[in-house]
Amino acid sequence: FLPLEDVEAIELRPDVPRLAIEHLGLDDDPRLYIRIGDAVELLPSAEPADLIFVDLYNDLGPAPGHLAWTFLESCQKKLQPNGWLVINQWATDDGKPLGAALLRGLFHRHYWELPVKEGNVILLVPGDLDQALDIDALTARAQALAPRLGYSLEALIKAIRPAT
């Protein structure tokens, strides 16, 4: 659904790529390069990116190193101009992301949150403070994709909120 030239993935758990290939239809695509290891250690050698997804969990729950100021700041600095950092984060009982105070301080409340049913909050962090989230363009793109996806993303887009 995206015109990708190459994708570099850093996965902590070696079984995840194997399971994705065996059960989720992940193809052996020459554009995909998977590195196994801790992103805290491997991020410095990663290429700059237009889009970085961070899943802040290990087998026991939130990974402390991945919810650290220096790591998240390094992720944001790896972004190309107009890039986006997307963080899958646990939600607390009040619906805010775990580490909300750290996130507000680091990103100056310049990010958006998308609460999801599973109890997580997806954070959409722009590469710099001049970037804005264009909801109209996002909605138009989602509407164009809906027939290919077989479902609508409209409810998710409507749930996007400013940083709490």
Language-model features, listed with the residues they occupy:
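The AdoMet/dcAdoMet-binding core of the Class I SAM-like
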Residues: 1-77
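A generic structural signal for alpha->beta connector loops
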Residues: 4-6, 29-31, 82, 108-110, ...
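Generic structural "secondary-structure junction" signal
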Residues: 26-28, 92, 151, 162
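SAM/dcSAM-binding transferase cores
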Residues: 112, 117-164
